[in-house]
Amino acid sequence: QCWIEAPFHCDYGTQITIGDHFFANYDCIFLDVAPIVIGNHVFLGPRVSLYTAGHPLTAQIRNLELEFGKPITIGDSVWIGGDTTVLPGVTIGPETVVAAGSVVTKDLPGGVIAAGNPCRVLRSLSEEDRAFWLAQREAYLQGST
């Protein structure tokens, strides 16, 4: 199951691999000049941008219209908040939460909460986090019956 809200933009579409139970909210952009690999149970907020493309820093070379591509990999069960940009070559580990508005310039390990520009790890997800959200789920289910 894969759900992508319109509008959505990608360069080619042939370099994108998406796992099961994927959701991308409105206005996502995937610049896929290099592979983008997305795991299972991944959620993207509105206006998340995945940029595999980059350009040389020096104007003389950039003016030759050269670009490069580096892959992006997003692990299973990752949630990326809205208005986040993921730059070329980044890997985001499984079960990580990236806060809205972040700019991810470097790899993030699994099981953490990360935020900022540049994005950095704030803390690891804990057993207390898991217990809290399991209790919230139970309360929700009891209230909806």
Model regions and ranges:
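HATPase_c (GHKL) ATP-binding subdomain of two-component histidine kinases
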Residues: 106, 115, 121
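Hydrophobic/aromatic residue at the end of a short beta strand that borders the catalytic acidic motif
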Residues: 92, 104
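Short-chain dehydrogenase/reductase
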Residues: 79, 97, 103, 113-115
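Short arginine-rich
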Residues: 106-111, 141
